[in-house]
Amino acid sequence: MCWSFHLFFKAHKARVGARTSFLTEMERGSRDHHRDHRDHREHRETREPPTLAFHMKSWKTINKSLKAFAKLLKENTTVTFTPQPSIIIQSAKNHLVQKLTIQAECLFLSDTDRFLTKTINNHIPLFESFMNIISNPEVTKMYIQHDSDLYTRVLVTASDTCTQASVPCVHGQEVVRDTGRSPLRIDLDHSTVSDVLKWLSPVTKTKRSGKSDALMAHIIVQVNPPTIKFVTEMNELEFSNSNKVIFYDVKNMRFNLSAKNLQQALSMCAVIKTSCSLRTVAAKDCKLILTSKSTLLTVEAFLTQEQLKEESRFERMGKQDDGKGDRSHKNDDGSALASKQEMQYKITNYMVPAKNGTAGSSLFNEKEDSESDDSMHFDYSSNPNPKRQRCVV
């Protein structure tokens, strides 16, 4: 019996030891789990927030372009950082939105999953503006960090300084985007864009007290033959299909734009020295879209039409020339005079506002029926206009 009790006690001791060992392993595993969780939480709290930075080698190749853009993008300008990554600088004014996109090839993002889209104002008190930072050749490093939904941290390093600022975010700011659908596409090479800018320069520099903002530029696109005309009160410029002006999709269209807005949009496209694509979006307010792209930068300008309020001097000049022609040719053959007046009507009627304030709609129907090359020119019956130009390259 003593032997049986000894075996029972030994078995009970083994069971208690096994249970104690099992509980010890559970406690040890629980402690390890909590320690790992605490270490992970501390690591997450102490690790760097997601950071967006420039590849400095690529940035140096576009520094001069960014310096030019800094002069063009000043007022009403916002900067948006996206996790693609990309940086979108957008400026808005009346009837014109300009957009500069710095592509992913020029940027580095440490954590695409945790970096959220953020928008700030271009104006940063400590640095004057964001555009001034990225166009400054003395900058050696620049970081944009996301560690709060309310602000963006900007860190800038130059040769002898290191500065950071917390910039408040702008909420509710929309980025204008191209829908990609257009019935019109015309590509102008860089030299053609430069020619149009030179042609616009005298118009936009004209000083008229209180009327400088009302200077208009009309863009006329015609199908047969494919041509694009730039028309102002002072002169006109015309291009036909060539290796410098390529018509991909053509539709009879007319745009009434601010001359200054058109000049600024073309100036944006001219900075990166590539071809400029003219497209349109068929909407309530018809937009003309100008786009230029390089490997690292994309420029877009969205222009909406201006309302023609009154008859322009260029239109009045055409009417006066009609009157002079009638008086100077009153002894000519009647059929020849009627033919000349009909031709003049074809040329100038699209610029004369209709009674309801909109432009006449009969130009393109008549233009398509006419195969005469003369109908593409302004044929003044008095002295010819020396400022009229026709470009066929």
UniProtKB/Swiss-Prot annotation:
Top-level taxon: Viruses
Iron-sulfur among keywords: no
Species: Human herpesvirus 6A (strain Uganda-1102) (HHV-6 variant A)
SUPFAM superfamilies according to UniProt: DNA clamp (SSF55979)
Gene that encodes it: U27
Region (Disordered): 25-50, 311-339, 355-393
One record GO biological process: viral genome replication
Protein name as catalogued: DNA polymerase processivity factor
Function (record text): Accessory subunit of the DNA polymerase that acts to increase the processivity of polymerization.
